């Protein structure tokens, strides 16, 4: 699997940036098919725990660390993407099952998610919107896969 959520056009099914798609597929093949000891894909959700009004997320395939990143794809004639200052793409919900956009921070190899609108959080979703703006990556520049912690 290769995550391409960050290399496409939100109004087109097929990403214009074929290079990064191919590069990511090749990394996955090198790891999975050929057994190379490399980071072959982006962070994958592993588990969550609740601590007070926060949800703590853990991941596999994170490499040495999780980082905020930007899309490698820059449309012709556009300036480079600015360096992100805030982790985006996370929604959080409580018992009412209503998701709101959340604050998220990277702490070591975990992501801490919270919102002042959700006192007792139960679930997190990442990348759950049309044309989501997601910026969680590993240090190799590979994006995290969208995920959900609920089954609602």
Q: At which residue positions do the language-model features occur?
A:
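Catalytic cores of secreted or luminal carbohydrate-active enzymes
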Residues: 1-88
